[in-house]
Amino acid sequence: MDFFQYFFRYYWQLVYMICLMLYITMYILIYNFTGKTLQTVKYFLYPSCTAMLIAMTMAFATQTRNIDNTHSMALLCDGFCKYIGPTFCFYCYNLYTAFGIVVNLINLHTMYYRTLCLKYLDAKKVRLWTLVFMWHYLCPLIYLIVIITSPQRHLEVSMETLSLHPNFDYTPYLTFGGFSQAQKELLDKAAMSLSLISMYYPLIGTYWKHKAMKMLKSHMSPNTSDATRAMLQTLIKGLNFQILLPMLRYIPLTAIYFMIKYTGEQFLISQYTITVLGTIPCILDPLVQIYFIRDAIRKFLACNSSPVRRIYDSWASRMII
């Protein structure tokens, strides 16, 4: 085993334990500190936290090392999935990819909902357009269905990998497979789509952030408390930061993808980075949510404890409830 194999074997155990503690903390905060007045928040926080937990669990289950071949891409898995077989590892890897996209969509969906709450006074119209956004979730679902239902040829992938990279130590990975030639073509198209998504998420998220901040300044009552103003602005900025987090994954992955295509060579460290880079948002995202949930709830409850302020803050509080 080389240095990277030893390093990432311990890396995954440490990172997964940290993430588990963060997600447990998130569930406790959501359950105990978001009551009836903050009911709508749960509709976004629970799915977001669950999707992150699933994505991180699938990443831990695979602990994938990606080998880019001429006609295929091998998945050398060092997680517990390797004891079940290459087909199970293949499913876990694609679930990790799909739920990683879902997390990003939920964050974008949350920002969209906040903007709608400021734009429309009619709650029915807000719910309608919030539901319309849900067609975005068809994208990871279609990707998952297409890639999983396509023919799997793990033996061919394994044979090509062994012939092209005979010097690698394959003993820790047991029996492995990966994406066949047809699946690799789909994967290449998906990589191109991710490069476009890496621009779409921050652009549309930043647009909605500026739109929401502008409406906050123009619509908010002069009698609205300073705490409510600060809380709403901080909440929107926090959501925008969450939307930008995936760029920590997509930009390096896109750069690595084009570098491999241009040079025709894959550096050793790049074989480990595809799955590892996905763990960065999984760690930072719950940290951001934990911070802003506690801060937003504390300020919201402080504002609503005053009967004088409550009347003037009712419009602004729609951003949360």
Curated annotation (Swiss-Prot):
Gene Ontology CC terms, in alphabetical order: membrane
Stored InterPro entries: 7TM_GPCR_serpentine_rcpt_Srd, Nematode_rcpt-like_delta
Record's bilayer topology term: Multi-pass membrane protein
Top-level division of the source organism's lineage: Eukaryota
Pfam families: 7TM_GPCR_Srd
Location, primary (coarse class): membrane
Record-annotated disulphide pairs: none
Membership in a protein family: Belongs to the nematode receptor-like protein srd family.
PANTHER family according to UniProt: SERPENTINE RECEPTOR, CLASS D (DELTA)-RELATED, SERPENTINE RECEPTOR, CLASS D DELTA
Record protein name field: Serpentine receptor class delta-63
Protein source organism: Caenorhabditis elegans
Lineage: Eukaryota, Metazoa, Ecdysozoa, Nematoda, Chromadorea
